[in-house]
Amino acid sequence: MQSARFFGKVAPMQFRVRWPSLIVCGFAFTGAALGERPAQADLDHIREELGVNSFTAPSIQLVFQELNALKPIPFDKAWRDLPDATPQDRARLALSTGAVIADGFLTVTAEKQSRIEPVGRVLMKLAKGLGVGEHVTKHSRSILEKAARQQWDEIRQELVRTQAEVEAALLGLKDEEIAHLVALGGWLRGLEMTTSIVADNYSPERARRLIQPELMEYFLDRVSTLNPNFKKTKLAATMDKNLKEIRRLTTKRADVPVELDEVKQVRSLVREINTLIAHGEE
Protein backbone atom coordinates (compact mmCIF):
# COMPACT_ATOMS: atom_id res chain seq x y z
CA MET A 1 0.00 0.00 0.00
CA GLN A 2 1.33 3.41 -0.93
CA SER A 3 1.84 5.98 1.79
CA ALA A 4 -0.61 8.89 1.71
CA ARG A 5 0.58 12.50 2.01
CA PHE A 6 -1.67 14.68 4.12
CA PHE A 7 0.19 17.96 4.43
CA GLY A 8 2.13 18.06 1.18
CA LYS A 9 1.80 20.12 -1.97
CA VAL A 10 -1.75 20.69 -3.16
CA ALA A 11 -3.23 21.95 -6.39
CA PRO A 12 -3.22 25.75 -6.92
CA MET A 13 -6.99 26.05 -6.43
CA GLN A 14 -6.94 24.22 -3.11
CA PHE A 15 -6.11 25.25 0.42
CA ARG A 16 -3.51 23.63 2.63
CA VAL A 17 -5.01 20.53 4.20
CA ARG A 18 -6.74 20.99 7.53
CA TRP A 19 -8.41 18.49 9.78
CA PRO A 20 -12.02 19.64 9.49
CA SER A 21 -13.49 18.65 12.67
CA LEU A 22 -12.41 16.67 13.71
CA ILE A 23 -10.38 13.60 12.55
CA VAL A 24 -9.90 11.80 13.15
CA CYS A 25 -8.64 9.49 12.27
CA GLY A 26 -6.88 9.20 12.55
CA PHE A 27 -7.59 12.76 15.03
CA ALA A 28 -1.56 19.42 16.91
CA PHE A 29 -3.39 21.64 19.13
CA THR A 30 -2.32 25.29 19.50
CA GLY A 31 -2.90 28.33 21.66
CA ALA A 32 -2.42 29.19 25.29
CA ALA A 33 -6.04 28.31 26.03
CA LEU A 34 -5.14 24.66 25.64
CA GLY A 35 -1.86 24.94 27.50
CA GLU A 36 1.59 24.07 26.21
CA ARG A 37 1.21 21.55 23.41
CA PRO A 38 3.69 18.77 22.75
CA ALA A 39 5.75 19.03 19.59
CA GLN A 40 4.29 17.31 16.54
CA ALA A 41 7.39 15.13 16.51
CA ASP A 42 6.44 13.88 19.97
CA LEU A 43 2.93 13.04 18.81
CA ASP A 44 4.30 11.25 15.77
CA HIS A 45 6.67 9.32 18.03
CA ILE A 46 3.78 8.09 20.16
CA ARG A 47 2.24 6.49 17.08
CA GLU A 48 5.55 5.30 15.64
CA GLU A 49 6.56 3.49 18.83
CA LEU A 50 3.25 1.63 18.67
CA GLY A 51 3.77 0.64 15.04
CA VAL A 52 1.26 3.15 13.65
CA ASN A 53 2.91 5.07 10.81
CA SER A 54 2.28 6.81 7.50
CA PHE A 55 0.78 3.63 6.06
CA THR A 56 -2.21 4.09 8.35
CA ALA A 57 -4.71 6.91 8.58
CA PRO A 58 -3.91 10.32 10.13
CA SER A 59 -4.27 10.63 13.89
CA ILE A 60 -7.66 11.76 15.13
CA GLN A 61 -5.86 14.03 17.61
CA LEU A 62 -5.65 16.69 14.87
CA VAL A 63 -9.24 17.55 15.74
CA PHE A 64 -7.82 19.55 18.66
CA GLN A 65 -6.23 21.98 16.23
CA GLU A 66 -9.56 22.80 14.63
CA LEU A 67 -11.59 22.90 17.83
CA ASN A 68 -9.06 25.21 19.44
CA ALA A 69 -8.98 27.50 16.40
CA LEU A 70 -12.78 27.82 16.53
CA LYS A 71 -13.04 28.74 20.22
CA PRO A 72 -15.19 29.69 22.01
CA ILE A 73 -17.02 26.44 21.34
CA PRO A 74 -20.83 26.37 21.66
CA PHE A 75 -20.64 22.95 23.32
CA ASP A 76 -24.36 22.20 23.20
CA LYS A 77 -24.42 22.89 19.44
CA ALA A 78 -21.52 20.50 18.77
CA TRP A 79 -22.43 17.77 21.28
CA ARG A 80 -24.64 14.77 20.48
CA ASP A 81 -26.21 12.00 22.51
CA LEU A 82 -23.74 9.14 22.72
CA PRO A 83 -24.79 5.89 21.01
CA ASP A 84 -26.37 3.48 23.49
CA ALA A 85 -26.23 0.32 21.37
CA THR A 86 -23.18 -1.65 20.25
CA PRO A 87 -23.18 -2.29 16.48
CA GLN A 88 -23.06 -5.95 15.51
CA ASP A 89 -20.85 -5.51 12.42
CA ARG A 90 -17.18 -4.59 12.68
CA ALA A 91 -17.33 -1.77 10.14
CA ARG A 92 -19.90 0.20 12.15
CA LEU A 93 -18.09 -0.74 15.36
CA ALA A 94 -14.87 0.80 14.02
CA LEU A 95 -16.60 3.91 12.69
CA SER A 96 -18.42 4.35 16.02
CA THR A 97 -15.18 3.93 17.97
CA GLY A 98 -13.51 6.72 16.02
CA ALA A 99 -16.55 8.95 16.44
CA VAL A 100 -16.62 8.47 20.22
CA ILE A 101 -12.90 9.24 20.46
CA ALA A 102 -13.73 12.50 18.67
CA ASP A 103 -16.54 13.10 21.18
CA GLY A 104 -13.90 12.70 23.87
CA PHE A 105 -11.73 15.35 22.24
CA LEU A 106 -14.68 17.75 22.15
CA THR A 107 -15.40 17.09 25.82
CA VAL A 108 -11.78 17.68 26.80
CA THR A 109 -11.39 20.80 24.66
CA ALA A 110 -14.51 22.27 26.28
CA GLU A 111 -13.29 20.96 29.69
CA LYS A 112 -16.63 19.32 30.47
CA GLN A 113 -15.64 17.08 33.35
CA SER A 114 -19.12 15.57 33.78
CA ARG A 115 -19.10 14.20 30.21
CA ILE A 116 -15.79 12.34 30.50
CA GLU A 117 -17.09 9.23 32.26
CA PRO A 118 -19.97 8.58 29.79
CA VAL A 119 -17.55 8.88 26.86
CA GLY A 120 -15.12 6.46 28.51
CA ARG A 121 -17.89 3.96 29.24
CA VAL A 122 -19.15 3.91 25.64
CA LEU A 123 -15.62 3.76 24.26
CA MET A 124 -14.82 0.74 26.43
CA LYS A 125 -17.90 -1.09 25.17
CA LEU A 126 -17.05 -0.41 21.54
CA ALA A 127 -13.39 -1.36 21.96
CA LYS A 128 -14.39 -4.67 23.54
CA GLY A 129 -16.62 -5.33 20.55
CA LEU A 130 -13.61 -4.83 18.27
CA GLY A 131 -11.55 -7.18 20.41
CA VAL A 132 -9.17 -4.45 21.59
CA GLY A 133 -10.75 -3.62 24.94
CA GLU A 134 -7.58 -4.30 26.91
CA HIS A 135 -5.81 -1.57 24.93
CA VAL A 136 -8.41 0.98 26.04
CA THR A 137 -9.00 -0.05 29.66
CA LYS A 138 -5.79 1.38 31.10
CA HIS A 139 -6.25 4.65 29.26
CA SER A 140 -9.90 4.96 30.33
CA ARG A 141 -8.92 4.61 33.98
CA SER A 142 -6.14 7.14 33.59
CA ILE A 143 -8.46 9.57 31.80
CA LEU A 144 -11.00 9.40 34.63
CA GLU A 145 -8.31 9.97 37.25
CA LYS A 146 -6.86 12.93 35.35
CA ALA A 147 -10.33 14.38 34.74
CA ALA A 148 -10.96 14.40 38.49
CA ARG A 149 -7.79 16.51 38.80
CA GLN A 150 -8.68 18.55 35.69
CA GLN A 151 -5.38 17.67 34.00
CA TRP A 152 -6.70 18.41 30.53
CA ASP A 153 -3.42 18.40 28.61
CA GLU A 154 -2.56 14.97 30.00
CA ILE A 155 -6.03 13.69 29.08
CA ARG A 156 -5.41 14.78 25.50
CA GLN A 157 -2.27 12.69 25.43
CA GLU A 158 -4.19 9.68 26.76
CA LEU A 159 -6.77 10.05 23.98
CA VAL A 160 -4.03 10.23 21.35
CA ARG A 161 -2.46 7.08 22.78
CA THR A 162 -5.84 5.36 22.90
CA GLN A 163 -6.39 5.74 19.16
CA ALA A 164 -2.80 4.82 18.37
CA GLU A 165 -2.95 1.64 20.45
CA VAL A 166 -6.30 0.63 18.96
CA GLU A 167 -4.86 1.10 15.46
CA ALA A 168 -1.72 -0.83 16.36
CA ALA A 169 -3.76 -3.70 17.82
CA LEU A 170 -5.95 -3.89 14.72
CA LEU A 171 -2.92 -3.87 12.46
CA GLY A 172 -1.46 -6.66 14.58
CA LEU A 173 -4.63 -8.60 13.82
CA LYS A 174 -4.11 -7.87 10.09
CA ASP A 175 -7.25 -5.72 10.24
CA GLU A 176 -5.97 -2.69 8.35
CA GLU A 177 -9.36 -1.82 6.84
CA ILE A 178 -10.92 -1.60 10.30
CA ALA A 179 -8.03 0.59 11.50
CA HIS A 180 -8.76 3.01 8.65
CA LEU A 181 -12.46 3.01 9.56
CA VAL A 182 -11.63 4.09 13.12
CA ALA A 183 -9.91 7.14 11.62
CA LEU A 184 -12.75 7.76 9.17
CA GLY A 185 -15.32 7.65 11.98
CA GLY A 186 -13.37 10.25 13.93
CA TRP A 187 -13.03 12.46 10.88
CA LEU A 188 -16.74 12.30 10.09
CA ARG A 189 -17.77 13.13 13.64
CA GLY A 190 -15.21 15.92 13.72
CA LEU A 191 -16.58 17.39 10.51
CA GLU A 192 -20.05 17.42 12.01
CA MET A 193 -18.69 19.25 15.06
CA THR A 194 -16.85 21.94 13.11
CA THR A 195 -19.68 22.61 10.68
CA SER A 196 -22.00 23.07 13.66
CA ILE A 197 -19.55 25.46 15.31
CA VAL A 198 -18.94 27.44 12.10
CA ALA A 199 -22.65 27.64 11.29
CA ASP A 200 -23.31 29.00 14.79
CA ASN A 201 -20.79 31.84 14.30
CA TYR A 202 -20.08 32.10 10.58
CA SER A 203 -17.28 33.98 8.91
CA PRO A 204 -15.56 33.22 5.58
CA GLU A 205 -12.25 32.70 7.38
CA ARG A 206 -13.72 30.19 9.82
CA ALA A 207 -15.46 28.39 6.96
CA ARG A 208 -12.13 27.99 5.14
CA ARG A 209 -11.17 25.43 7.78
CA LEU A 210 -13.66 23.05 6.17
CA ILE A 211 -11.60 22.81 2.99
CA GLN A 212 -9.35 19.73 3.21
CA PRO A 213 -8.77 18.35 -0.30
CA GLU A 214 -6.15 15.70 0.43
CA LEU A 215 -7.97 14.26 3.44
CA MET A 216 -11.20 14.20 1.45
CA GLU A 217 -9.54 12.31 -1.40
CA TYR A 218 -7.84 9.96 1.04
CA PHE A 219 -11.06 8.95 2.76
CA LEU A 220 -13.03 8.70 -0.49
CA ASP A 221 -10.33 6.31 -1.66
CA ARG A 222 -10.71 4.31 1.57
CA VAL A 223 -14.48 4.08 1.04
CA SER A 224 -14.01 2.87 -2.55
CA THR A 225 -11.84 -0.04 -1.40
CA LEU A 226 -14.03 -1.30 1.45
CA ASN A 227 -15.22 -4.88 1.76
CA PRO A 228 -17.69 -5.63 -1.09
CA ASN A 229 -20.35 -6.85 1.35
CA PHE A 230 -20.17 -3.63 3.37
CA LYS A 231 -20.32 -1.56 0.17
CA LYS A 232 -23.79 -3.03 -0.47
CA THR A 233 -25.18 -1.44 2.71
CA LYS A 234 -27.14 1.78 2.94
CA LEU A 235 -24.43 3.24 5.17
CA ALA A 236 -21.67 2.65 2.62
CA ALA A 237 -23.78 3.99 -0.26
CA THR A 238 -24.75 7.09 1.73
CA MET A 239 -21.15 7.63 2.79
CA ASP A 240 -19.90 7.50 -0.79
CA LYS A 241 -22.67 9.74 -2.17
CA ASN A 242 -22.53 12.33 0.61
CA LEU A 243 -18.73 12.57 0.72
CA LYS A 244 -18.67 13.24 -3.02
CA GLU A 245 -21.25 15.99 -2.54
CA ILE A 246 -19.23 17.45 0.35
CA ARG A 247 -16.17 17.44 -1.92
CA ARG A 248 -18.15 19.36 -4.55
CA LEU A 249 -19.37 21.94 -2.03
CA THR A 250 -15.92 22.55 -0.56
CA THR A 251 -13.83 22.57 -3.75
CA LYS A 252 -13.14 26.28 -4.05
CA ARG A 253 -10.63 28.72 -5.45
CA ALA A 254 -8.48 30.34 -2.77
CA ASP A 255 -10.42 33.60 -3.07
CA VAL A 256 -13.89 31.99 -2.88
CA PRO A 257 -15.24 31.22 0.61
CA VAL A 258 -17.56 28.40 1.61
CA GLU A 259 -20.89 30.19 2.08
CA LEU A 260 -23.05 29.77 5.18
CA ASP A 261 -25.69 27.81 3.26
CA GLU A 262 -22.96 25.46 2.02
CA VAL A 263 -21.66 24.97 5.57
CA LYS A 264 -25.16 23.96 6.62
CA GLN A 265 -25.44 21.59 3.66
CA VAL A 266 -22.16 19.92 4.61
CA ARG A 267 -23.38 19.58 8.19
CA SER A 268 -26.60 17.95 7.01
CA LEU A 269 -24.75 15.53 4.73
CA VAL A 270 -22.23 14.42 7.33
CA ARG A 271 -24.88 14.22 10.04
CA GLU A 272 -26.86 11.80 7.88
CA ILE A 273 -23.79 9.54 7.69
CA ASN A 274 -23.12 9.79 11.42
CA THR A 275 -26.73 8.97 12.27
CA LEU A 276 -26.49 5.77 10.23
CA ILE A 277 -23.21 4.91 11.97
CA ALA A 278 -24.68 5.43 15.43
CA HIS A 279 -28.14 3.93 14.94
CA GLY A 280 -27.93 1.63 11.94
CA GLU A 281 -30.43 1.41 9.10
CA GLU A 282 -33.52 0.56 11.10
Locations of regions flagged by a protein language model:
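A cross-kingdom marker for long, charged
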Residues: 228-282
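Bacterial N-terminal signal peptides that target proteins for export
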Residues: 8-23
